[in-house]
């Protein structure tokens, strides 16, 4: 096996007199200018910059960010703007941005498209959900952070086909990267003798390479990754994940400098939180009534230097580490816990509010899936922390404090979302509390602790936090198994993207790959429906179905939520109906009911009416979502869409139901755009240029591949789109919103019709209204008032009927009739048959129980039905009685001890079953 030792033998290290050494504590190899025993990273060493800043000057976040970016601009790097934290807005394989390299995966890193600049520098906001349980405890972890970075994208000069990559040659590599790092430290005034470069090979996403962790005074301030290998079962290098890797044609400098930690290093505060958001920490402490004495301040500062040991990813037992830290500081562990726990919660609240500001500010809407689930999880955990530590400020106010710092313009929407979510959480807790008590009873009976799997399910289904489960379970004497990384476990469970797509497959895929790309004529003239082409290949699918490939086509294949065109392919001898059109790679396949013949010249005719309706609905989809964003807010984004000939639907991410007034406003705005008869234009710009001009709202309908992307512009709305569209908005005619419904939490479906389909939908509604008016014998405009009057009368008569039923039940209960009274111990049971519906049976049973008697009633109205009701204080289980009775009529039933119902199909056995009732009652009572 070959390792990466040689990869770290840098000329720069040799020139600067670095020594390669092994840490006596953890065994890692590292480089430093002076001889030392350990690598300097916790737990091998403590933080050595608390009250001892590592740089010449104290910097704020803003100042540190500018210092970094300016440093690299001075070294010929181009500064680019940061991307959103919601990575699924430009890629479909991840949810959140966790590193600056996410901005360039997979298209740039694979060489498919060029980077926006090369080399470049950026300060990228990131969110790492896996760090959530460490936040507040270690003093250094933040779930939301900015990764300052510089990147260089290189391609080897000896590759066979350099034109297949979007960049070429070497910009710079390892020596220059380490030198830049050293120079940055020097410019900040760091003591270069204290800097340690730890060898730590990197693996991720099928790629790998040597990497270096940069440690200064106990803090990891940077990671320098040299992505240069790809997974290969026959590869030369075996990496720490157990897989083998080989060099790849491209090699990339991927660095990460934590903005928050650099700022912390410059200030030397006890934790990173005081350095990053001092005003909010001060506000939270004051609001929660936390005031520290001088001695308590001393303890906090001393403990902070050792807090790096509290990393749940490294420590085997967090509480044992706390015991050790308390002993070293010289206090009892309980005193340490009582002092630090509220502070840790305060730190977590500040961090989580910043995370929420990033999430909601970038348009993530809380829901039960994907990024929405993660936002909801953070919000609910934060609310629990706020309540637990005694902060009485509303959560929306706390999140807004961070949103203001981050300069988001949609702060009103952010606050509205938080308020809505807090109210939903309250309702969820009311429902979920009952489930926790039930679960506690179950495990109390088993004599087992409530396991982690149940905790995760409680959190997913009801939003119940582990500490609430512990509190309720303790009342029942039941332990709870809460792992230290509980929230990371939950987040990982929902870490996959919620927009997975299925790739089309065909049994002759290999043969399709040999065919040339189909020329797509429908992009040249979307209104044209006739064309001529040559048949390149015909595949026999079955006896009467053929898949035909042409050199060019006007038929649009299914894609982007738009169904395929239909029509005919004709020769002098054959007229084949085109029933389906699909795209496989660059080849378009037409499914036909006849074989036009390979090599034949064909005339294509697209169904013009169908094409026109689909174009109207597709362009209308763009207009409707643009209108929805104008009315509901910029957070609104497409979650799915489907176009048809009679109607279309678009699913949007929104945090509450859409009122009728809002629907009408969306509809009015959409029709204004249509009446303005705006030109619908298409262009094919470079991807980077398009993203720079319009941002990632381009990708409402999905993320296209390729260096150039097709943009459709309708007024102020610009989207990347591959569908067919009308030439001007006036060609749509009109749009009518037909329905709105919540299809899942955080997703609203808008169904609408356009063009003639809108007229037809309106006519159907008018027909229904006219028919209702005829039935009610009133004018159409009087239908709502008349329907409301009839409904009120119907409800009133229903109440009268119920009252009469109750009176009849009371009369029967007191008057005897066919009912039989039997003794059951000290109680009396009334047994009888009443051929009535279940409502009346229940009413009479209630009347009998109110008199202090057991009720056993049967009905033969619909099969055989029973109701058994038992008054308080009588030791008879109604569920057991019903079970016995129902068994005699071929059915089943049950319920709680005081009331049960059931039945079966054998109505002929009803009377015999009731005859057995007295004996059943006595047996159950004596059991």
Swiss-Prot record:
<feature type="binding site">
    <location>
        <position position="618"/>
    </location>
    <ligand>
        <name>Zn(2+)</name>
    </ligand>
</feature>
<protein>
    <recommendedName>
        <fullName>Alanine--tRNA ligase</fullName>
        <ecNumber>6.1.1.7</ecNumber>
    </recommendedName>
</protein>
<dbReference type="GO" id="GO:0004813">
    <property type="term" value="F:alanine-tRNA ligase activity"/>
</dbReference>
<feature type="region of interest" description="Disordered">
    <location>
        <begin position="888"/>
        <end position="912"/>
    </location>
</feature>
<dbReference type="InterPro" id="IPR050058">
    <property type="entry name" value="Ala-tRNA_ligase"/>
</dbReference>
<dbReference type="InterPro" id="IPR018162">
    <property type="entry name" value="Ala-tRNA-ligase_IIc_anticod-bd"/>
</dbReference>
<keyword id="KW-0648">Protein biosynthesis</keyword>
<dbReference type="InterPro" id="IPR045864">
    <property type="entry name" value="aa-tRNA-synth_II/BPL/LPL"/>
</dbReference>
<dbReference type="GO" id="GO:0000049">
    <property type="term" value="F:tRNA binding"/>
</dbReference>
<dbReference type="GO" id="GO:0008270">
    <property type="term" value="F:zinc ion binding"/>
</dbReference>
<dbReference type="GO" id="GO:0002161">
    <property type="term" value="F:aminoacyl-tRNA deacylase activity"/>
</dbReference>
<feature type="binding site">
    <location>
        <position position="721"/>
    </location>
    <ligand>
        <name>Zn(2+)</name>
    </ligand>
</feature>
<keyword id="KW-0436">Ligase</keyword>
<dbReference type="InterPro" id="IPR002318">
    <property type="entry name" value="Ala-tRNA-lgiase_IIc"/>
</dbReference>
<dbReference type="Pfam" id="PF02272">
    <property type="entry name" value="DHHA1"/>
</dbReference>
<keyword id="KW-0479">Metal-binding</keyword>
<dbReference type="GO" id="GO:0005524">
    <property type="term" value="F:ATP binding"/>
</dbReference>
<keyword id="KW-0820">tRNA-binding</keyword>
<dbReference type="InterPro" id="IPR022429">
    <property type="entry name" value="Ala-tRNA_lgiase_arc"/>
</dbReference>
<dbReference type="InterPro" id="IPR009000">
    <property type="entry name" value="Transl_B-barrel_sf"/>
</dbReference>
<dbReference type="InterPro" id="IPR018165">
    <property type="entry name" value="Ala-tRNA-synth_IIc_core"/>
</dbReference>
<keyword id="KW-0067">ATP-binding</keyword>
<feature type="binding site">
    <location>
        <position position="725"/>
    </location>
    <ligand>
        <name>Zn(2+)</name>
    </ligand>
</feature>
<dbReference type="Pfam" id="PF07973">
    <property type="entry name" value="tRNA_SAD"/>
</dbReference>
<comment type="function">
    <text>Catalyzes the attachment of alanine to tRNA(Ala) in a two-step reaction: alanine is first activated by ATP to form Ala-AMP and then transferred to the acceptor end of tRNA(Ala). Also edits incorrectly charged Ser-tRNA(Ala) and Gly-tRNA(Ala) via its editing domain.</text>
</comment>
<keyword id="KW-0030">Aminoacyl-tRNA synthetase</keyword>
<dbReference type="Pfam" id="PF01411">
    <property type="entry name" value="tRNA-synt_2c"/>
</dbReference>
<dbReference type="InterPro" id="IPR012947">
    <property type="entry name" value="tRNA_SAD"/>
</dbReference>
<dbReference type="InterPro" id="IPR018164">
    <property type="entry name" value="Ala-tRNA-synth_IIc_N"/>
</dbReference>
<dbReference type="InterPro" id="IPR003156">
    <property type="entry name" value="DHHA1_dom"/>
</dbReference>
<feature type="binding site">
    <location>
        <position position="622"/>
    </location>
    <ligand>
        <name>Zn(2+)</name>
    </ligand>
</feature>
<dbReference type="GO" id="GO:0006419">
    <property type="term" value="P:alanyl-tRNA aminoacylation"/>
</dbReference>
<comment type="similarity">
    <text>Belongs to the class-II aminoacyl-tRNA synthetase family.</text>
</comment>
<keyword id="KW-0963">Cytoplasm</keyword>
<keyword id="KW-0694">RNA-binding</keyword>
<keyword id="KW-0862">Zinc</keyword>
<dbReference type="GO" id="GO:0005737">
    <property type="term" value="C:cytoplasm"/>
</dbReference>
<dbReference type="InterPro" id="IPR018163">
    <property type="entry name" value="Thr/Ala-tRNA-synth_IIc_edit"/>
</dbReference>
<feature type="compositionally biased region" description="Gly residues">
    <location>
        <begin position="888"/>
        <end position="905"/>
    </location>
</feature>
<keyword id="KW-0547">Nucleotide-binding</keyword>
